[in-house]
């Protein structure tokens, strides 16, 4: 439960149709197994106490009384279970029979939630036996541990846990999810951020993918966690087969699902803090004034082992096909944004400072696409290489060859003489390789680019990426400044994949070779003299690994995670790559630079948002 994580379980027990005593034993057994795994919310299928396929046996008083006795047995067995448990059973109330979900915690029955939408089509005929839930909240008398208790009966119920801020749970049953307006919509806008669904969804060909999309889509639409527990093999197979397709989703992502046709326990770690952060960001997320019964349940405050995985590169899709689609999409967004600016300002040229590094390479590739979109010749791109004290032959040659292969206009301006003269003017010792020595070169390059843009009636295209801007790894009014920054919302780890995608898909073999060599070149501003002709100044040795900084950046910006939580999940994600001490070192560096360098981000040029 630390850091907003809570382990939940969707469970399919072995059952026998209409054998409530046996089913209660199996439910208790699975309940204890799920609790032993650390699960704090445990969800069983629809009508699991009796079995969903009892048909006209639901009219038998023996079955209904047996179901109540079984519920009481499960309730008592839950006394030592530190979890909120949901089980399904038929319940007679005011002369009508309802299909309900019973919420139990620490030996207490907290509430009964009836099913609203009863399917009576195709293979279903639930309206033969059950009454749909009405909108009215009622109370039933129930024998508690010490005295009679009044238990809420109705759909409008939310169960909340004071030991875990923000943990609010509501229930719906099977078909409730499949209708145009599920009860979970009202539950969510009333404040529930975890929805449980007790289901008995039969298996027919192709239904599993639809079900998976339905659960994932509902969790995305409602910005919630969704736990879906499905009936399994023990149900009658007279007409139907049930595959125990259990699913756990969070905000559009399927975190876990069972192997179909096997009754099993599926667990996952929901991130309640993440759900709440997403809802805070969504200022259009509505709230309801409807009356809801809020029932408290208690859980022990303890840390469970975190099983959830986190991608080392959260900005980059792990699947190759998804990654390629994402790269094409991002390049199109960048190029279209630049094309609009190019046409709107009636620019005659695009001026790009090309260094032979990743960022300027991506900017040049985007500029070429923008010209193609606008129907303008690529010779209108002025690709400027500006060798100085730190330039190596490798980056220089790559910059020149890249420009030629893309069909841009190459211009070389050697700035060594002008920088040396400038150092003499301000009294800077050329042998003192301090911040003035480095930034003087960066600002001279920007001045050259700005003047060339004026001279050619063009605009300077910024090359700096989001990771550099987050860390302030840019010279103020040097490479920090341009007239349109195409890479401003692209993190460094993604820049690398965008360039790689261009290399993989380009038809020009020589262009691909140049791009691969650029990818193989260490990241460097090349502001210090090389050693033996090779790059001596490596950015990641100075500010830290970009894969770590992009990981930190993602969870700071996207979900507002606290430093301790980021440190914890980074340790899990990069186990075996970086030790805890190294991660902490660069996390501290990240936060220091992120806040200290805000002044640079306060005056950035425009640039397209890509994600």
Task: Cite the ranges covered by each PLM segment.
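ATP/NTP-dependent adenylation/nucleotidyl-transfer catalytic domains that generate, transfer
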Residues: 7, 23, 165, 223-224, ...
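Enzyme catalytic cores with a strong preference for nitrogen-chemistry domains
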Residues: 1-353, 369-378, 410
